[in-house]
């Protein structure tokens, strides 16, 4: 495994760790998700280029489109939640509360 692959996997692992540890605010969770998607995009692109697998050359672009849609929906939810509750704490989103 090359140094580039290890750095990308380390970036993915750090984003996943950040998502698991700092999940009290919605904004930090969205940033960690974007870091995970970006590292997956780079890893997928490098893997396809190294293996000369031309049939799957559109797969990273499709992943990037889904990441952009996820970011747009996440930011729309963040704005709506911030306007409704006045904060972006995830604990306020529990549907079981009165």
UniProtKB/Swiss-Prot annotation:
One of its GO terms (molecular function) is NADH dehydrogenase (ubiquinone) activity. It is found in: Mitochondrion inner membrane. One of its GO terms (cellular component) is respiratory chain complex I. This is NADH-ubiquinone oxidoreductase chain 4L. It comes from Lipotes vexillifer. Core subunit of respiratory chain NADH dehydrogenase (Complex I) which is composed of 45 different subunits. Pfam families: Oxidored_q2. Keywords: Electron transport, Membrane, Mitochondrion, Mitochondrion inner membrane, NAD, Respiratory chain, Translocase, Transmembrane, Transmembrane helix, Transport, Ubiquinone. It catalyses: a ubiquinone + NADH + 5 H(+)(in) = a ubiquinol + NAD(+) + 4 H(+)(out). Its main location: mitochondrion. It is a multi-pass membrane protein. The chain crosses the membrane at residues 1-21, 29-49, 59-79.
